[in-house]
């Protein structure tokens, strides 16, 4: 048979292949000439599952415990499938429940059998909890195809897939570029969003036989396909997998701060595959039809408890997260499906936008599966809608990287009927930003660096700043004022002392205001007021991108809004001391701009801070802060000049 192909240093499956989002629920390649029904090419179900009860009937395996969870899992596969050839897939991790998840890929003659996996789950006690198996057990090819090389070249496979599926790809004059021993890339094609690739692999067929195939990957936007073309018959496609999950979400779309700013819409596939390549409904191990995935898990939590995995969450089989909601509906539990869906949507968009701005796996972001990109996985955000542990508030708990964050969105009783915090995006964004700032200030492994009164206040201010920047509208100018929490609190004044404004007569807060403040939200209002000044200075200089994502040039956002958000985010890791004060945070923002743009915006930044008393001469003393409207000498500036 075949020797074990498992050793340290073996190449893992490419990252895009590890992405296994929910297969498309649509039946055709819409918009293509002579539409093709993809259901004809779905893979057959071949897997088996051995649960814990069944494992306990196999004492020799159930009690097996030796070494790390990877070693235990490897030994199980050896014992269960003796003499099989396989390799470790590099997407293993330990989840928040303490269960280790390990996956193996079967190989034959050193070539992957692409639909033959063995996944093992190891419990907290180090013993095998359960496993799943789809290994191929039929007859093996008598010879290594790489020796005879009696199969078509990959270019023929690309043309075969293009013709069979009627894909809008042109490959005349394209060339083949080697990527690895069994994988190539096609350069010079048109019609695809990225260069198509082809990988030689086996496919276990429904009839029990094995087929050598070219797995041709083509991203054409509405469909991102893995097409398994027979390597010997150019007109035969065995299977097709579509990475694009066609899910719909009925929500207040990104940019609407609360229900007063617009109507709900039905959005199709709202995720960004560059920042959430597994989509929002998969984690690389599992595909979900409920509000859970790699970045977040959202559910109803009426008792306010800490257990959440078995709580109710909407789970439409057709992936249509479309539920009725009106602010006049009462009681709130009657629209819990809409509430959970909205909270899940807003939090996932936060993940995707913040990822673009720098909150990645290495920086300690919130993901179950980090896909080999660094950081610690196993830490999506737990999203509790209509949490019963409180009212008239929301909060976010941020443990170190590798442990899930937790957001609690409460019912607010200041209106009749009560209002649900899930529908105020400003509240959700504010809370999610706590996770961002706590992970970045002090590093992913230390979530204790925003606990002093002034640093804690800045944590609140950063949350307000991002929520306010995101809600800016196309017609807004520096004369536009915004309140925080107006809708959910049923108050035109919102939940802060003053609106965010560049008009000192509307919002008079300055650095020395902190001398009379001893509450973090109040101090945070001072900090965000300063950042709001900087934001508009940068917008006036660079313009404002009103789209949902930034446009970069050499890693720098081209507009002032996203540039301000990027500089503020970059500043957090630059803050050297734990629990920084306003002066140190201001300097970190200047340093971040110097690193990002070579200091091209220091004038605008200095003017924004100096206008509200955090100029060159500002000094920190916890009981007697000294304010300053001075800027460096090269910038002539009057304190209240815009």
Curated annotation (Swiss-Prot):
GO CC entries: extracellular region
Propeptide: 20-246
Cofactor(s) annotated in UniProt: Zn(2+)
Signal peptide as annotated in the record: 1-19
GO biological process, alphabetically ordered: proteolysis
Subcellular localization(s) per the UniProt record: Secreted
Lineage: superkingdom: Eukaryota
UniProt keyword annotation of Amino-acid biosynthesis present: no
Cofactor note: Binds 1 zinc ion per subunit.
Main subcellular localisation: secreted
GO molecular function, one term: metalloendopeptidase activity
UniProt-listed CDD domains: M36
Residues annotated as catalytic: 431
EC number: 3.4.24.-
Record: glycosylation sites: 287, 595, 624
Enzyme class, UniProt record, top EC level: hydrolase
Pfam families with a match to the protein in the record: FTP, Peptidase_M36
Family, as annotated: Belongs to the peptidase M36 family.
Protein name in UniProt: Extracellular metalloproteinase 5
Organism from which the protein derives: Arthroderma gypseum (strain ATCC MYA-4604 / CBS 118893) (Microsporum gypseum)
Gene name, Swiss-Prot/TrEMBL: MEP5
């Amino acid at each position: 048979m075949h020797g074990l192909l498992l050793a340290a240093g073996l190449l893992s499956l490419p990252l895009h292949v590890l992405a296994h989002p929910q297969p498309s629920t649509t039946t055709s390649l819409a918009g293509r000439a002579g539409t093709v029904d993809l259901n004809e090419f779905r893979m057959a179900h071949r897997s088996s599952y051995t649960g814990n009860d069944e494992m306990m009937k196999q004492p020799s395996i159930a009690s097996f415990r030796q070494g790390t969870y990877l070693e235990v899992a490897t030994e199980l596969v050896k014992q269960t499938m003796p003499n099989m050839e396989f390799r470790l897939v590099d997407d293993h991790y330990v989840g928040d429940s303490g269960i280790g998840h390990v996956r193996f890929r079967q190989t034959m003659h050193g070539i992957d059998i692409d639909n033959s996996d063995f996944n093992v789950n190891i419990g907290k006690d180090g013993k095998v909890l359960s496993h799943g198996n789809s290994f191929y057990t039929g007859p093996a090819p008598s010879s290594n195809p790489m020796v005879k090389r009696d199969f078509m070249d990959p270019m023929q496979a690309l043309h075969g897939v293009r013709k069979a599926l009627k894909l809008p790809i042109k490959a005349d004059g394209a060339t083949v570029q080697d990527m690895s021993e069994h994988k190539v890339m096609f350069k010079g094609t048109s019609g695809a969003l990225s260069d198509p690739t082809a990988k030689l692999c086996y496919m276990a067929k429904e009839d029990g036989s094995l087929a050598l195939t070219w797995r041709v990957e083509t991203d054409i936007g509405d469909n991102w396909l893995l097409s398994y073309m027979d390597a010997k018959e150019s007109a035969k496609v065995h299977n097709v997998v579509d990475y694009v999950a066609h899910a719909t979400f009925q929500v207040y779309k990104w940019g609407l701060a609360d229900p007063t700013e617009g109507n709900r819409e039905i959005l199709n596939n709202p995720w960004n595959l560059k920042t959430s390549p597994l989509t929002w409904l998969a984690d690389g191990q599992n595909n979900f039809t409920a509000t859970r995935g790699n970045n977040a898990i959202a559910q109803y939590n009426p008792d306010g408890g800490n257990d959440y995995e078995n709580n109710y969450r909407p789970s439409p089989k057709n992936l249509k997260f479309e539920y009725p909601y009106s602010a006049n509906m009462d009681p709130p539990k009657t629209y819990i499906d809409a509430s959970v869906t909205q909270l899940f949507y807003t939090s996932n968009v936060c993940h995707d936008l913040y990822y673009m701005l720098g909150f990645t796996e290495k920086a300690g972001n919130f993901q179950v599966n980090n896909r080999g990109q660094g950081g610690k996985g196993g830490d999506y955000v737990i999203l509790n809608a209509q949490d019963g542990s409180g009212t008239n508030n929301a909060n976010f708990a941020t443990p170190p990287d590798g442990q899930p964050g937790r957001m609690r969105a409460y019912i607010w009783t200041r209106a009749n009927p009560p209002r649900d915090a899930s529908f105020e995006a400003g509240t959700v964004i504010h809370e999610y930003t706590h996770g961002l700032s706590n992970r970045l200030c002090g590093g992913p492994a230390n979530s204790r660096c925003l606990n002093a009164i002034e640093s804690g206040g800045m944590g609140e201010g950063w949350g307000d700043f991002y929520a306010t920047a995101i809600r800016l509208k196309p017609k807004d100018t520096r004369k536009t004022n915004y309140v925080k929490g107006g809708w959910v609190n049923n108050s035109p004044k919102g939940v802060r002392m003053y609106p965010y404004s560049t008009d000192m007569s509307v919002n008079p807060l300055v650095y020395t205001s902190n001398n009379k403040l001893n509450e973090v939200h109040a101090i945070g209002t001072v900090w965000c007021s300063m950042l709001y000044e900087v934001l508009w200075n940068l917008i006036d200089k660079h313009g404002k991108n009103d789209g949902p994502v930034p446009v970069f040039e050499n890693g720098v956002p081209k507009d002032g809004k996203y540039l301000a958000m990027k500089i503020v985010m970059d500043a957090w890791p630059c803050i050297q001391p734990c629990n920084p004060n306003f002066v140190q945070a201001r300097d970190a923002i200047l340093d971040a701009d110097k690193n990002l743009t070579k200091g091209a915006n220091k004038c605008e930044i200095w003017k924004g801070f100096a206008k509200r008393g955090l100029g060159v001469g500002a000094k920190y003393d916890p009981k007697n802060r000294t304010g300053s409207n001075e800027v460096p000498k090269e910038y002539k500036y009057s304190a209240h000049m815009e």
